[in-house]
C-alpha cells in the first residue's frame, strides 16, 4: 500500500464573535451531520475536558462511510484539530483556528493535511484532484455550518 500526503486550505467567515463561534463549533452534538446536509450518525465520547472521540457513519449515495476521529480542543487559542483514526483518509489531520474580525465577526482558517492510500503511487495530478475535491466538499459543509451557527446564535439573543 502506497501513502501520499497533500494539503488544502480555505477560510470561512462568520457573522458571530470569535469566542461564540469557537464554542458553537466545538460543542459537538449528535445532530451536527444534518447541519452539513449529511445523513448519518455521530457518536461522541468525551475522554477529557479537551479530548473527544467522534464515531461517524455517513450515508453517501449507495454506501456508508465510517470515520473515527480523535479531537483535541485548545479553547485558549480558539483552535482545535482532529486526526482521522479510521476512515477513507486514515491518519489525516484537520486544523481549525477561529480568528476575530472586529468584535462581531470572525473567520475560520481550515487546513486539511490528508493522507491518501492507494495500491500504486498516484500521479501528482490525481493527488491534486483529490485535494481539490476534498477542499470543495469541506468548504461547502462549512458554508452550511456558518448559516446554522448564525441562525442559532441570533435566536439566543
Predicted segments with their positions:
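Short amphipathic alpha-helical segments
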Residues: 17-20, 24, 133, 137-141, ...
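Beta-strand/loop substructures that line and gate deep hydrophobic ligand-binding cavities in soluble
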Residues: 83-140
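Beta-strand elements of well-folded, non-transmembrane domains
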Residues: 14-18, 58-62, 74, 86, ...
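Residue-level preference for beta-strand/loop junctions
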Residues: 4-6, 62, 90
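Hydrophobic ligand-binding cavity/cleft-lining segments
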Residues: 1-51
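Intrinsic-disorder/low-complexity, polar/charged segments enriched in Ser/Thr/Lys/Arg/Asp/Glu/Gln
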Residues: 5-13, 51, 77, 93, ...
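Hydrophobic/aromatic beta-strand elements that line small-molecule binding cavities or substrate pockets
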Residues: 10-12, 42, 65-72, 92-100, ...
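Glycine-rich portal/gate segments that line the openings of hydrophobic small-molecule binding cavities
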Residues: 29-33, 42-86, 140-157
Amino acid at each position: 500500500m502506497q501513502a501520499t500526503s497533500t494539503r488544502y486550505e480555505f477560510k470561512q467567515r462568520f457573522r458571530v464573535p470569535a469566542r461564540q463561534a469557537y464554542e458553537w463549533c466545538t460543542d459537538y452534538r449528535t445532530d451536527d451531520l444534518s447541519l452539513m446536509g449529511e445523513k448519518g450518525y455521530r457518536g461522541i465520547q468525551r475522554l477529557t475536558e479537551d479530548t473527544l472521540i467522534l464515531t461517524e457513519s455517513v450515508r453517501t449515495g449507495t454506501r456508508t462511510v465510517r470515520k473515527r476521529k480523535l479531537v483535541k480542543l485548545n479553547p485558549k487559542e480558539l483552535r482545535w484539530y482532529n486526526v482521522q483514526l479510521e476512515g477513507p483518509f486514515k491518519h489525516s489531520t484537520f486544523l481549525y483556528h477561529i480568528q476575530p474580525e472586529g468584535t462581531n465577526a470572525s473567520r475560520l482558517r481550515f487546513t486539511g493535511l490528508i493522507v491518501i492510500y492507494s495500491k500504486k503511487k498516484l500521479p501528482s495530478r490525481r493527488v491534486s484532484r483529490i485535494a481539490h475535491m476534498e477542499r470543495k466538499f469541506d468548504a461547502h459543509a462549512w458554508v452550511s455550518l456558518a448559516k446554522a451557527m448564525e441562525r442559532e446564535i441570533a435566536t439566543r439573543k
